[in-house]
Design a protein with these regions (language model features):
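Sec/Tat signal peptide C-region and signal peptidase I cleavage site
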Residues: 19-23
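Positively charged n-region of N-terminal signal peptides that target proteins for export
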Residues: 1-4
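Lectin-like carbohydrate-binding module/patch detector with strong preference for beta-trefoil
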Residues: 25-193
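Short beta-alpha connecting loops at secondary-structure transitions
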Residues: 673-684
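Aromatic-residue-lined binding/catalytic grooves and analogous aromatic/hydrophobic interfacial grooves
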Residues: 193-613, 630-632, 649-652, 662-667, ...
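Bacterial N-terminal signal peptides
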Residues: 8-16
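Extended, hydrophobic alpha-helical segments in both membrane/secreted and soluble proteins
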Residues: 551, 617-631, 640-657
Length: 799
């Protein structure tokens, strides 16, 4: 059981731990709104100058610096722009200007030095400033502020790790710490959220619940950053398997950021890493519910008290709860319903007439402008291959609702339901990868209308029954565990080994892994990507693509062992369609010199397209084929096996033709690589050999099951048996020489990663352990053998 728990920890890491992108295709976005410029004298519009990275505004601090703090309405935080877009001065309501100083200041309160900070002054900045549209849109569209008197590093920049109290310095263009927007204090909070006070008494109704006592937008980040990190570390994901959302739990502005698994830019082509043709997984957009109740604010007397937000894994329900100073209790509930194929938000209060909001939509990394009519909002558009459509409908009970060009306003309601739908015209089986484009808008509209015609109670009951038909198939409980600490507190205390609390976190990991599997892998025949189906990042790391060198496979390790076989099918059908029905993967095999079979490379999009990054990783076909066989082993579905067997056989033919006979009489995979380090190309790499061994073994076993239905020629069968019998299994040991430190004693036996190169050719402490496929998932070595006993040393040697 402990080993299976680790699989779910791995799944969680695979879905939600990002890596910094080295390149990502940019998407065009509409220009940000231009602020007002005044020529001279009094008057004009005063703005908060808000940095999108940390949602803080330029403020005059006590140490005579311009620093970033939450907007509080102070006159020193409100700036007008005097001059023109190419040459202007900042002046606040106190008459102070902003100048570039040569007197260094701390980057943040107590942080490292900033050599050229912005400071307040009674005099103007020589040369002034200019505004230019920010090319970086990772956190949304905005402006860059350029100091006209500087060159090179001349763009105003949030200095240091984003937080509270950052000073302002300078950097080069196209950095996410540069991007600002100009917002009016009477229409924008100028802070991440209202003041909240967490509940001290809350305990979740269901034990398997992730819960927190502050909004995701204001939570302390483990990474030290802001922006996307709030999403990655604290937003709560919901999903129907294909369409999903992330919940931030804001009181002032409740953001429901949504995604759809097939919203990809790019084409079926092969392109350079991050090239436009390859595309990326796009951020679909967000719904914003701005609080208009007047009950809450930034001060203690107007704080939202008893604050809790949670994700109940037992019911797949998100929830936010808090109380006003007047004692009114507010509850917001969220589901992503697979039966209805929509995301639904439900707003209630303990007293009638207390719900007042303005609802708006915004596109994410795509270019689209929403329109509003009759309590609904929608936007649509087309990328290189696919078209998309999103629609929301606001359904109030009581109060008044008005709709204008800017959004939907509800005042004094007793209850509000918001229904959100979205989709694309993607079809995995069409040669164009699209179908029914002209009907897309009507399909989404009908879907939203059908859900909106039902009550929250009906939608919720359908959703829970559907979800629990999968989730309740498996139960894992650790004795003595109680969920009495916030989830972030469980994480903080885990390394100190606090008994039942540590076990509680492990139990949550297990449940969360299964929850994510159900929530990200139903519907369309396309697998979960590097982030499952969730992404709020415009310049997303590694394009949030389908990585074939462990990531997508790891997503599906829990599917069969924990009775979620149906969740495996989107990946399995993707493999089958690409291998047998679509041409791209056969083209990539030919590109690698093979006339038979199919393969893909390290980085893949949903159209069969690949990037040029590590395109010698052709062993992906063997690994994919093991998943086809695993599903049969758990289901014993012979008709399924008969359908997918041609893809298994074709992958075997690729390797039957490709293997090279070595001088030791064994067959080796040529020019292989052990992800993601060591020699770029070597024959007989353990990772590839172990994979081909499993592929051949499974293919022969499938032939035994199918008999004549396998339709294998006598020549191919004889060749397969010959190659299998003479295959180098990739199982050998070497002695550790002490080159990578003292984690294990010199002379300890470790598994060989390369047949001809020592372990020292690899990277010290590298994260991949690709030569341990023989242990898991393939079980090719047995306890009590020299090979099995070499595994602990191999793990320790890798750090």
């Amino acid at each position: 059981m402990k080993r299976i728990t680790l699989f779910f920890i791995a799944l969680f890491a695979c879905l939600f731990v990002g890596v910094q992108s080295t390149s990502a295709a940019a998407s065009k976005k509409a220009a940000p709104k231009t602020p007002e410029f005044v020529t001279s004298g009094d008057g004009g519009t005063y703005y908060y100058v808000k940095f999108l990275r940390n949602e803080k505004v330029m403020s005059v601090s006590s140490d005579n610096c311009i620093r970033l703090y939450a907007g509080s309405g102070e006159s020193s935080q409100q700036w007008r722009l005097v001059g023109s877009q190419d040459n202007f001065q900042f002046q606040n309501k106190d008459g102070q200007y902003i100048v570039v100083s040569s007197q260094s200041a701390a980057a943040t309160d107590g942080g490292a030095a900033n050599p050229n900070p912005l400071r307040p002054s009674t005099s103007e900045q020589p040369g002034g400033f200019k505004l230019q549209v920010a090319p970086n849109t990772d956190n949304g569209t905005g402006w860059e502020i350029v100091a006209n008197s500087k060159s090179g590093y001349n763009v105003v920049n949030l200095w240091g790790d984003p937080g509270d109290g950052n000073s302002i310095g300078f950097w080069k263009t196209n950095d996410q710490n540069n991007v600002v927007v100009f917002v009016k204090p009477d229409t924008d909070l100028g802070a991440a959220d209202y003041k909240t006070v967490g509940s001290m008494t809350f305990k979740p109704e269901n034990k398997l619940t992730l819960w927190y006592t502050e909004p995701a937008t204001t939570a302390k980040l483990y990474s030290g950053g802001q922006g996307y990190s709030n999403w990655m570390e604290y937003a709560l994901p919901i999903g129907d398997g294909q369409f999903g959302a992330c919940l931030f739990g804001g009181v002032y502005r409740d953001e429901i950021q949504f995604n759809e698994k097939t919203l990809w830019s790019g084409t079926p082509a092969r392109s350079s890493q991050g090239g436009k043709g390859y595309g990326k997984y796009e951020n679909f957009g967000s719904i914003y519910a701005k609080d208009l109740s007047g009950e809450f604010g930034l001060t203690t007397d107007k704080a939202a008290s008893n604050y809790v937000r949670l994700l109940d894994l037992t019911t797949a329900t998100g929830k936010t709860m808090f109380k006003s100073a007047a004692g009114v209790e507010y509850t917001r509930e969220y589901i992503a319903s697979n039966p209805a194929r929509v995301v639904v938000a439900h707003y209630t209060a303990s007293k009638g007439g207390k719900l007042s909001f303005r609802f708006t939509m915004a596109a994410g990394s795509i270019t689209a402008d929403p329109t509003y009519a009759n309590g609904e909002g929608t936007f649509s558009g087309k990328l290189e291959t696919i078209s998309y459509n999103a629609r929301m409908k606001v359904v109030p009970v009581g109060g008044t609702m008005t709709t204008d060009d800017e959004g939907i306003e509800v005042i004094g309601a007793d209850e509000i339901m918001v229904v959100l739908g979205g989709g694309t015209d993607f079809d995995a089986y069409e040669s164009t990868y699209t179908k029914n484009t002209s009907a897309l808008a009507q399909t989404i509209s009908d879907r939203v209308a059908a859900a909106a015609a039902k009550s929250w109670a009906e939608l919720y009951a359908e959703h829970v029954a559907d979800y629990q038909s999968f989730f309740n198939r498996c139960e894992f409980d650790l004795a003595g565990t109680k969920n009495e600490m916030t989830t972030n507190s469980l994480i903080d205390s885990y390394n100190s080994g606090r008994g039942a609390d540590a076990l509680m976190l492990e139990q949550l990991y297990f449940a969360y892994g299964r929850y994510l599997e159900i929530s990200s892998s139903r519907g369309v025949d396309s697998p979960s990507n590097l982030q499952g189906i969730w992404n709020n990042i415009n310049g997303v790391a590694w394009n949030s693509d389908i990585h074939s060198n462990i990531n997508v496979q790891m997503n599906y390790w829990p599917a069969e062992p924990t009775n979620l076989s149906e969740m495996h099918l989107p990946f399995l059908n993707y493999i089958w369609a690409m291998a047998e029905k679509q041409p791209q993967w056969k083209q990539w095999a030919k590109l690698q010199g093979q006339n038979r079979g199919w393969t893909c490379f390290t980085e893949n999009n949903i159209f069969g397209g690949v990037s040029a990054f590590k395109n010698n990783y052709v062993i992906a076909n063997a690994w994919y084929a093991t998943h086809l066989w695993q599903h049969y082993r758990y289901t014993l579905d012979r008709e399924y096996l008969k359908r997918v067997f041609p893809a298994m056989l074709s992958a075997s033919q690729f390797w039957m033709d490709r293997l090279k006979l070595a001088s030791d009489g064994t067959y080796e995979c040529p020019n292989e690589w052990s992800p993601e380090h060591g020699p770029e190309s070597e024959n007989g790499v353990a990772h590839a050999q172990q994979l081909v061994y499993d592929l051949f073994s499974n293919t022969l076993a499938a032939i035994e099951v199918l008999g004549d239905d396998a339709e294998v020629s006598a020549t191919d069968l004889a060749t397969l048996k010959d190659r299998f019998s003479k295959l180098d299994k990739g199982l050998a040991t070497e002695n550790y020489t002490g080159s990578f430190g003292s984690a294990i004693p010199t002379g300890t036996k470790i598994l060989r990663e390369w047949k001809y190169s020592s372990y020292t050719r690899g990277e010290n402490g590298h994260r991949h352990m690709s030569h341990l496929m023989c242990l898991y998932p393939f079980s090719q070595i047995e306890p009590g053998t020299e090979l099995f006993d070499a595994v602990p040393g191999s793990i320790c040697e890798n750090g």
